[in-house]
A protein has these predicted regions:
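Flexible, glycine/proline-enriched loop segments at strand-loop-helix junctions
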Residues: 56-57, 157-162, 184-193, 245-250
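Short, glycine-/small-residue-rich phosphate/pyrophosphate-handling segment
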Residues: 139-178, 182
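Short acidic/polar capping segments at secondary-structure boundaries
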Residues: 139-140, 163-167, 191-195, 215-219
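Fold-independent oxyanion-binding glycine-rich loops
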Residues: 17, 113, 138, 189-191
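N-terminal export signals
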Residues: 2-30
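Short, aromatic/basic amphipathic alpha-helical patches
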Residues: 144-152, 197-206
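Conserved anion/nucleotide-ligand pocket segment
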Residues: 176-205
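Metallocofactor- and cofactor-centric catalytic cores in central/energy metabolism, strongly enriched
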Residues: 31-119, 123-144, 175, 204, ...
Length: 267
């Protein structure tokens, strides 16, 4: 069967997009779709066994405990966007190597240096593909030199040197975006030409999955969706409005049914 393109008006296109947004709520997708969940970020603290800087009598355990409180507050502030896991205190390159191997499929890595001399502890993290953020308080050490070099050499890494926890807020949103891009799936409706170099480059950079169904493929899936379920969802949507001026109930139902259909072809 040859693909047939059916043109949409600007209003029809907008309604279709609106149906997708509404569908994520009306069909309970917020909690079930992998791209809608929070980012998982593993945190690790670095400190040499015998500190000399920022001072030789530094209580490393106390410093870590205070920062754990700060990071817990940060996580609560961004509940639903980021989950901070891990929290190991690494003293040796061997411990750092073991922690690096435990990162697995985490969306990001948060490194906190507590002392100077942590260069050897950083090396196991240098070649990881996991996006990395260094949280370095002023004068805590010189890890920022290593991480800056990583970024200059193309690693997905950044650093923030600050004593203000609020300066980490933008990075929590970035981690959430990284998670979303890694887990989401994009449908490009075309004439069956398949992947292109732009999509392949985007996948390499962000991990996003692309599907390239033809119009007839999408139409077939659309028609297989439960029209009654879409009609029920449309009624729920309409009841939540003060007044539905436009679109018609048929249009709302069709938009929500289209949303349902987009969940199938990329699985």
């Amino acid at each position: 069967m040859s693909d047939t393109f059916v043109p949409l008006s600007r209003r029809e296109f907008g309604l279709s997009l609106g149906g997708c947004l509404l569908g994520s709520r009306l069909f309970g997708a917020d909690s079930s779709l992998p791209w809608m969940g929070p980012a998982t970020v593993k945190k690790v603290f670095l400190a040499v066994p015998q500190p000399t800087w920022p001072r030789p009598d530094l209580d490393v355990a106390r410093e870590k405990a205070e920062l754990e409180v700060t990071l817990s507050e940060l996580e609560r502030k961004h509940a639903g966007s980021v989950v901070l896991t891990g929290g190991d205190l690494v003293h040796t390159p061997e411990q750092a190597e073991a922690f690096a191997k435990s990162i697995g499929d985490a969306d990001g890595l948060l490194i906190i240096d507590l002392t100077s001399g942590t260069g050897p502890l950083l090396r196991p993290f240098r070649d990881l593909a996991t996006p990395t953020l260094l949280f370095a308080r002023p004068y805590s050490g010189w890890s920022y030199v290593d991480v800056t070099t990583w970024a200059q050499n193309g690693k997905k890494a950044d650093l923030v040197s600050t004593s203000e926890a609020g300066d980490l807020d933008p990075y929590m949103r970035i981690f959430r975006t990284i998670h979303h891009l890694r887990r989401c799936k994009v449908l490009v409706i075309n004439s069956g030409t398949g992947p292109n170099r732009t999509a392949e480059a985007f996948t390499r950079q962000f991990g996003t999955a692309f599907g390239f169904p033809g119009y007839q493929d999408l139409k077939a899936v659309y028609e297989s969706m439960d029209a009654g379920q879409a009609r029920t969802a449309a009624g729920e949507f309409a009841r939540g409005a003060l007044k539905v001026v436009e679109p018609s109930m048929d249009d709302i139902t069709a938009s929500l049914r289209l949303y349902q259909s987009t969940l199938g072809p990329t699985d």
